[in-house]
Every structure is written in C-alpha cells, then in structure tokens.
C-alpha cells in the first residue's frame, strides 16, 4: 500500500487539483506495482484564463458559444449563448494515479469540484492498493458502487471515465507501451478526421474529409428556423464543392417532427448525417427519425449517453453511427464494449472528440473508419489541440490525418502541464 500522500490543490468554482501519494522509495517488479490514487483539480486564476479541460469554457467571440441551438434555446433568456445557461460551470477534473515505483498516469475530463469530491470521498477505496493491471476490476467496482446515485450517467460517469483513463495511461507507462498496443494494436496506419466547427470551408483547406456545423435554430423557431439552417448548409455546399462531407450537429435541441423536416430540407445539399437531434433517452424518437430520414442520409447520436446499457438500447434503434465520448461514457473500458455492440449490428462507432483518449481506441477499431477533431480556435482558422494548455505534446492532425507512429509513446503519450495552477478542494 502506498505511503500517505500530500495534495496540492486549486479550486475557483471550475478547475481541478492534484493529489499525489509519496513514493515510499522501494522498487518493485513493474507487473506487481500497486496504484495510489491521485486527484487533480486544475484551475487557472481569474486573471489568466487557462480553460480547455472543459472546452466549452471559452472566451468571448468563440464559435462554440455563438447562438447554437440547445434544449434551452426555447427560453429566450438563454438562446444566444450556451454559457448563459451554464454549459461551462462544471470545470476540469484531472485524476492522477501513481504506482509504487513512482510512475504516474493521468487523465482529463469535465466534472470539476464535484468530481474531485467523488474520487476523494468514495472512489479512492477501489483504486489504492490495486495492481496497475486491475483496470477492469476497478472499473466494475466503481460502476456498481455508484449505482445508487449515478442514474444513467452524467457527472458520476464523467468522474469514473477520468479515473479509468488515468489507469490506462499508467498501465501503458509501467509496461512501456502506447495504450493502442495494450488494446491489441492498430488496424490501420493512420486516422483520418473530419472537423467540427463553424467553418467547414476552412476545414477542407486544412485537409479534413468533412466538416460538421452546429445548428442555430430549433422547434420554437418553426419552419423559418428550418429554412435558415438549410440555407447555411446550401451556402457551405457551394463553398466546399460536392465531394466534401457536410454534417449537422443538433445538440439535443429538436423533436422528431422538426428533425425530420430539417433532414429533408438539407437532403438536396447531400448532407452526410444529422446528429443528436433528440435528448438521449428518446429512443423511440430516434427509431422514428431513422425510419423517416432521407435515403442515404445517416442518423447519429451518443455524445450524451452515459452507460453501456443506454448504448445498447440506442444501437437497437437502428441509427447508423454511435458517438460516445470516452471522457463521459465510462472511460476506455466502456468505449471498447460500445464498439463491440456497434460492430455486432454493422454500425460505426465514431467517438465524440476527446483527442488522444479517442485516438488510441479508434485506431484499433475496425468499425471506425474516421474520427472527429474539434476545432477549438475561436474562428476555426487555425489548428489548436483540444486540451491545450493542460496537455503537453498533444498531437493535432496534419492534412487531416494522424499517423500511428505519432501515438508510439507509453500510455496516451501526453504529459500534464504543471505550469497550470493545481489545487485540491478535498482530501481523504
């Protein structure tokens, strides 16, 4: 069992900290190393914004907060900005785990101070003292121990995901292998990406295979809203040409009737797919939308589904692509299981963003022919790592691609930026 530790922590209402048990100085066979939990609440003080663990927490004039349709858009007070209803309040959670030999693994998600509390006061008991390879055991214990308050995902699952990813990172570093090799190795030489952002035309110039735009209108806007978003797609089709993929991200903001009308309004412009039109649990709605969507247009969802069971039910609706976020769905351990469910039904699994935490998974999946890159620059004109500045050495696509050799570093191949202000609101 690791010796008692010291925590360095930081909290401003939205950022993460670091807990680090002392190394007891002993040396062990790496395969027998035990892990001590390390929780990181990282934050940047109010005078210097250092966001991006929570990529929604951006500054003014950023495309990601510019009149994007949401479930709250029907309330005029919260229509213009997603930050107005609090999309950025959770903040960043960083979890670190340390083996007895002093090696550490870490991961990033969104759960903020509340996630820190869950790890420190509850989940730590399932981590400390375990072998670094006991990832599935720890994962199962965390899931079952939180059933009585986790519901169908959300904050608790974000936290569990972060712990799981940190454990995979540590395991890879202990054995000296990239995570994708721990999963069985790459099935292709490179990952090709589409870009999510407001400017698919710029994404095309950067070498991406497609561009996914947010919708700006919803059912409360009636047919006028449908026409406005269809005009946006038509305009981008003219700019990008016929062969470039165009997709729409509806972010849970629609109902079946509106989504069906929007899909048909965009069909003349060769829309490749329409994404997450409905709230997560409206499975019958997704089934109906898929049944009535234009021929050749895919229906996709999954970003805000939080359990393996919810993905199994979603798969049964017949949608074309499932899109879990590895930082929210239960971690890499669950993502692998989701990919297997999708594969058994002939469906694709294309995770939502998540940078290296997705890269190491999707390059091993035979049913992930492409992946998502989230444009985090304010106007989508430059390439910026999703988790900058928290992660160091975070790769970005070159000409829309990342070669597997870029991932050939132990663990997830990134380091925690210790220049970010690290604090801890809780101890155990």
Swiss-Prot record:
One of its GO terms (molecular function) is magnesium ion binding. The record marks 325 as: Increases basicity of active site His. Pfam families: MR_MLE_C, MR_MLE_N. The record marks 372 as: Transition state stabilizer. Keywords: Lyase, Magnesium, Metal-binding. GO terms for biological process: amino acid catabolic process; carbohydrate catabolic process. Binds 1 Mg(2+) ion per subunit. Its EC number is 4.2.1.90. Substrate binds at residues 56, 82, 372. The active site is at 352 (proton acceptor). SMART domains: MR_MLE. PROSITE patterns: MR_MLE_1. The keyword Nucleus does not apply. The keyword Translocase does not apply. It is an enzyme of class 4 (lyase). Catalyzes the dehydration of L-rhamnonate to 2-keto-3-deoxy-L-rhamnonate (KDR). Reaction proceeds via a syn dehydration. Belongs to the mandelate racemase/muconate lactonizing enzyme family. RhamD subfamily. HAMAP family: Rhamnon_dehydrat. Homooctamer; tetramer of dimers. This is L-rhamnonate dehydratase.
């Amino acid at each position: 069992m690791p010796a008692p530790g010291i925590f360095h922590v930081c909290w401003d209402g939205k950022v993460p900290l670091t807990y680090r048990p002392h190394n007891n100085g002993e040396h062990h066979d790496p395969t027998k190393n035990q892990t001590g939990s390390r929780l990181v609440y990282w934050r940047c003080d109010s005078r210097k914004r250092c966001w991006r663990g929570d990529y929604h927490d951006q500054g003014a004039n950023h495309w990601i907060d510019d009149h994007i349709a949401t479930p709250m858009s029907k309330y005029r007070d919260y229509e213009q900005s997603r930050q107005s209803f609090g999309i950025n309040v959770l903040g960043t959670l960083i979890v670190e785990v340390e083996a007895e030999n002093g090696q550490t693994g870490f991961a990033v998600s969104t759960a903020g101070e509340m996630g820190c509390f869950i790890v420190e006061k509850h989940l730590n008991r399932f981590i400390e003292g375990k072998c670094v390879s006991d990832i599935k055991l720890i994962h199962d214990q965390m899931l079952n121990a939180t059933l009585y308050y986790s519901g169908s995902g959300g904050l608790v699952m974000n936290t569990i995901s972060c712990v799981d990813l940190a454990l995979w990172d540590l395991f890879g570093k202990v054995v000296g292998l990239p995570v994708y090799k721990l999963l069985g190795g790459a099935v292709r030489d490179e990952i090709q990406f589409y870009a999510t952002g407001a400017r698919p035309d710029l994404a095309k110039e950067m070498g991406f295979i497609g561009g996914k735009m947010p919708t700006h209108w919803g059912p409360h806007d009636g047919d006028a809203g449908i026409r406005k978003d269809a005009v946006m797609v038509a305009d981008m089709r003219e700019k990008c040409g016929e062969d470039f993929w165009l997709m729409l991200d509806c972010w849970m903001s629609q109902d079946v009737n509106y989504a069906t009308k929007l899909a048909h309004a965009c069909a003349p412009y060769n829309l490749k797919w329409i994404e997450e039109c409905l709230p997560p649990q409206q499975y019958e709605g997704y089934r109906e939308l898929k049944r009535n969507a234009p021929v050749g247009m895919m229906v996709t969802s999954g970003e805000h589904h939080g359990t393996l069971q919810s993905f199994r039910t979603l798969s049964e609706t017949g949608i074309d692509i499932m899109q879990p976020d590895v930082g929210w769905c239960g971690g890499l351990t669950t993502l692998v299981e989701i990919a297997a469910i999708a594969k058994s039904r002939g469906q694709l699994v294309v995770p939502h963003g998540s940078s290296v935490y997705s890269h190491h998974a999707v390059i091993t999946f035979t049913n992930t022919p492409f992946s998502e890159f989230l444009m985090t620059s304010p106007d989508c004109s430059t390439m910026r790592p999703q988790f900058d500045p928290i992660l160091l050495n975070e790769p970005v696509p070159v000409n829309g691609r990342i070669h597997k050799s870029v991932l050939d570093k132990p663990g997830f191949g990134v380091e925690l930026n210790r220049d970010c202000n690290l604090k801890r609101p809780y101890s155990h």
